[in-house]
């Protein structure tokens, strides 16, 4: 009697890569393979890599090396897989290498080295929504691949290609399956969410298709309207500041999607933004932020910035600090510029020293922590909707509409027993305390 083959799996990198991992795992289970969390008893190991910055490349190479040492039979996929020579130079014994979102190629290689079982005992166990690596109450929904921008600090287009939007009906069908399975929050991701469908012809964008018996158009605003009809939280990530983003704010004000906008602005100095090949009209950005908040006062704005970009002067950096003070963003991430092999910025003149990067990073964070603390303090005394993420002997932890999982803060809920609530439930919490990242409250 043949035994069911075991496949070990390692997933690294961002939420977009996690979605790719979920797709591969779903294919593996559908084909009858058993997924295990260890190398020891695996017939083969798949490593889904990240290659965005040098530290991610190093982490991926170390994971590949560990899998080879512990098991010996390894297939590599993901963003770093687009640089096959770099992997082969360090790990020549890797069996096969594919680039990102190469699901069919990965499965072809798996079948080559570990033939699919004749009898599939898992077919009936694969859920309609597929295998998910997130908790049952939230899921990432990827609406497109690739990116048409050529930011000088980034090599993603060279690994994931140009923008390729999924058909709107396909996206909505997946969203409905997730909602029907019990998912309470959808996190919309892509390399450039606001560019959804812009890679398609005007004819295709304006073409009427049908979903749930209703005629719809193929564009971001329609997509968000339809996602909002599912009756669950819908959160937008990686939103490039196109003009039509303004049209999303009324949907947030109406409660159709969460009042949360993740816009990676990267800097505030026009000179630095030009060198990055990013939009440079920072005054216009401030005007838009003011208008957005007038339309939707509950709007949470998250952004990310890079300090120490080549050529960044003290004057440029001060412009960034001044922007933080004026914009009063709610959630902010900051990265020190990291040279990436293949990125234009890596070869630019006037590289900033590591000491200066570190010093500017800490100054940046001091300013933003003060701003974030003040904005969270304004929530004390208010009652917020909170989705429960964790319940254990130490208490209950959830997130408000202003908090995305893993990257934002949390809400610690007191005076509530684990018998009274369950993970994924949305409850009302009265906020009693705040710091620069998190909130505390009671029911």
From Swiss-Prot:
Catalytic activities: L-aspartate(89)-[ribosomal protein uS12]-hydrogen + (sulfur carrier)-SH + AH2 + 2 S-adenosyl-L-methionine = 3-methylsulfanyl-L-aspartate(89)-[ribosomal protein uS12]-hydrogen + (sulfur carrier)-H + 5'-deoxyadenosine + L-methionine + A + S-adenosyl-L-homocysteine + 2 H(+)
Pfam families: Radical_SAM, TRAM_2, UPF0004
An annotated GO cellular component: cytosol
Domain of life: Bacteria
GO biological process, one term: tRNA modification
GO molecular function (one): metal ion binding
Entry keywords, A to Z: 4Fe-4S, Cytoplasm, Iron, Iron-sulfur, Metal-binding, S-adenosyl-L-methionine, Transferase
Residues the entry annotates as binding [4Fe-4S] cluster 1: 14, 50, 79
E.C. number: 2.8.4.4
Enzyme class: transferase
Positions of the TRAM domain: 377-443
Residues covered by the Radical SAM core domain: 133-374
Functional summary from the UniProt entry: Catalyzes the methylthiolation of an aspartic acid residue of ribosomal protein uS12.
Family: Belongs to the methylthiotransferase family. RimO subfamily.
Listed PANTHER family: RIBOSOMAL PROTEIN S12 METHYLTHIOTRANSFERASE RIMO, RIBOSOMAL PROTEIN US12 METHYLTHIOTRANSFERASE RIMO
Protein name: Ribosomal protein uS12 methylthiotransferase RimO
Organism of provenance: Actinobacillus pleuropneumoniae serotype 7 (strain AP76)
Organism taxonomic ancestry: Bacteria, Pseudomonadati, Pseudomonadota, Gammaproteobacteria, Pasteurellales
UniProt gene name: rimO
């Amino acid at each position: 009697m043949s035994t069911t083959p075991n496949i070990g799996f390692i997933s690294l990198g961002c939420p977009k890569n996690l979605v790719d991992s979920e797709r591969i795992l779903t294919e593996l289970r559908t084909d009858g393979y058993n997924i295990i969390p260890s190398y020891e008893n695996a017939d083969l190991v798949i490593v889904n890599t990240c290659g965005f910055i040098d530290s991610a490349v190093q982490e991926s190479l170390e994971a590949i090396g560990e899998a080879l040492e512990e098991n010996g039979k390894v297939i590599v996929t993901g963003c770093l897989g687009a640089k096959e020579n770099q992997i082969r130079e360090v790990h020549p014994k890797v069996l096969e290498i594919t680039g990102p979102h190469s699901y069919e190629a990965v499965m072809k290689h798996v079948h080559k080295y570990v033939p699919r079982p004749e009898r599939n005992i898992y077919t009936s166990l694969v859920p309609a929504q597929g295998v998910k690596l997130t908790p049952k109450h939230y899921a990432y929904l990827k609406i497109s691949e690739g990116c048409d921008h050529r930011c000088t600090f980034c090599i993603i287009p060279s690994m994931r290609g140009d923008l390729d939007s999924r058909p709107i009906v396909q996206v909505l069908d997946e969203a409905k399956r997730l909602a029907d399975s019990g998912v309470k929050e959808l996190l919309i991701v892509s390399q450039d969410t606001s560019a959804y469908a812009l890679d398609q012809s005007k004819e295709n964008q304006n073409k009427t298709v049908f979903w749930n018996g209703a005629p719809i158009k193929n564009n971001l605003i329609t997509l968000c309207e339809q996602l909002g009809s599912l009756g669950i939280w819908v959160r937008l990530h990686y939103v490039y500041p196109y003009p039509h983003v303004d049209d999303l704010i009324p949907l947030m004000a109406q409660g159709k999607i969460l009042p949360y906008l993740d816009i990676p602005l990267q800097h505030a100095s026009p000179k630095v933004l030009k060198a990055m090949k990013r939009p440079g009209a920072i005054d216009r950005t401030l005007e838009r932020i003011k208008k957005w908040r007038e339309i939707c006062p509950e709007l949470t704005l998250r952004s990310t910035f890079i300090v120490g970009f080549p050529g960044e002067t003290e004057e440029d950096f001060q412009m960034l600090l001044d922007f933080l003070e004026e914009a009063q963003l709610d959630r902010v991430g900051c990265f020190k510029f990291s040279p990436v092999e293949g990125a234009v910025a890596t070869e630019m003149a006037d590289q900033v020293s590591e000491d200066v990067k570190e010093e500017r990073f800490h100054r940046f964070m001091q300013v933003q922590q003060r701003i974030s603390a003040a904005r969270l303090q304004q929530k004390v005394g208010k009652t917020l909707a909170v989705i429960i993420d964790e319940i254990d002997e130490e208490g209950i932890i959830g997130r408000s509409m202003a908090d995305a999982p893993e990257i934002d803060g949390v809400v610690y809920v007191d005076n509530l027993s684990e018998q009274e609530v369950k993970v994924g439930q949305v409850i009302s919490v009265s906020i009693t305390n705040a710091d620069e990242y998190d909130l505390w409250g009671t029911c």
